[in-house]
Amino acid sequence: MAWKKIAEKGEIVIGKGKAFKIDNKQIAIFNQDGYHAIDDLCVHQDGSIAPGKLEGDIVECPLHFWHYNIKTGELKDYLKDVKLATYHVETRNDGIYVDI
């Protein structure tokens, strides 16, 4: 894996998420008690979770309301043992980096 700059500081509003494409992966970065990165792909019907509503560590897919933990990637309802990939995030002087 390698660290890649994905965003500028302040680009992702507190309490919100934003989708980014990097190395052919669609990644959602959430700014909720720090930055958290997970695959931006709901396993239900491949919708983007980045614009979903955040409540604590849980994001709700805006298409059909499935819920994922933004820190662990774990699906919180409907199917057991389903997780989206998570990625380490670092905030540096020149921006936000993800280990892809």
What does each of the following model-derived ranges do?
Residues 1-56, 70, 83-100:
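N-terminal pre-ligand scaffold of iron-sulfur
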